[in-house]
Amino acid sequence: MMSGSRLASRLIIIFSIISTSFFTVESIRLFPDSFDDASSDLMEAPAYQNGLDCSVLAKNRLLLACDPSAVHIAMTLDPAYLRGTVSAVHSILKHTSCPENIFFHFIASGTSQGSLAKTLSSVFPSLSFKVYTFEETTVKNLISSSIRQALDSPLNYARSYLSEILSSCVSRVIYLDSDVIVVDDIQKLWKISLSGSRTIGAPEYCHANFTKYFTDSFWSDQKLSSVFDSKTPCYFNTGVMVIDLERWREGDYTRKIENWMKIQKEDKRIYELGSLPPFLLVFGGDIEAIDHQWNQHGLGGDNIVSSCRSLHPGPVSLIHWSGKGKPWVRLDDGKPCPIDYLWAPYDLHKSQRQYLQYNQELEIL
């Protein structure tokens, strides 16, 4: 875990190093021409090994995939966000004391599964992972247009189907978006207990205006809005969640989320923000509140409009570039926000090797 002041100091040093360097950043394709291009554009990550105090788990990936003693992390694999996913994985491995005890469950569309798995193996040769196919037809007919096209991607809804996509032997998982980096030991997040019958845990933001996540049509319909009558719902970001998959399956929460999507699609427009509102409708007011340090979100701002964001006060364990702006896009354009320099040391794109080259100088901080 890093304090806000420590991250600020690190940020100043990174910025100083980069601004005085002799190199220039070449123009980079955001979307590679092929998956082979994506693989060749990425460097192999350093090898990370368990510390002496780590439990010895199965070396066989098939066995580790079902081992409840392992830390299980689920992420989507979207070619457009592959660079972000790779950086997120890199940050997790770098900051955990037991990297060999982590198993990654990646979800990809059927057309890209094999190529993406090959890319991951080349970047992380010793990584324990499995790539699952998400059939986009499962949810495509339930998606209604939102305020941002990126939110309409079927893969964005895969988080609602983890209990069905992942092997039934997986009873608990951490779900992470692709635009995060972890600067603390992920085992701390994994060990958080979900009290009572709660199915998910996430940082909760009760100061946010909860009503804005739904339309006037929703709030004026007593039958629909009564879902919150016995609760005190608060906003939470679905980009970082600890999920009890056994409780999820028992509660059949995927169907409950789908039911709200059907109302949105077939009856009346009750929300505008893609996959988030159905989660709020089903779980709002009934989640395990996790410390805010595990999702310093909303840092994306905008790639085009100058709207850089700053870290929130307090300790930081996970930094999340949610929103339109992504650090790799701004860095490539030569117009980064200061916060983007905290993402850069985990970037494994070959054009960014300078950040990795100087990263050792930052270890003393």
UniProtKB/Swiss-Prot annotation:
Lineage: Eukaryota, Viridiplantae, Streptophyta, Embryophyta, Tracheophyta
Major subcellular site: Golgi
InterPro entries cross-referenced by the UniProt entry: Glyco_trans_8, Glycosyltrans_8_dom-fam, Nucleotide-diphossugar_trans
Cytoplasmic compartment segments: 1-10
Entry similarity comment: Belongs to the glycosyltransferase 8 family.
Transmembrane segments: 11-31
Domain of life: Eukaryota
Known function: May be involved in pectin and/or xylans biosynthesis in cell walls.
Induction: By methylviologen (MV), a superoxide radical generating drug.
Source organism of this protein record: Arabidopsis thaliana
Sample GO molecular function, one term: polygalacturonate 4-alpha-galacturonosyltransferase activity
Signal sequence annotation: none
Enzyme class, UniProt record, top EC level: transferase
Keywords: Cell wall biogenesis/degradation, Glycoprotein, Glycosyltransferase, Golgi apparatus, Membrane, Signal-anchor, Transferase, Transmembrane, Transmembrane helix
The name this protein goes by in its record: Probable galacturonosyltransferase-like 10
GO cellular component, one term: Golgi membrane
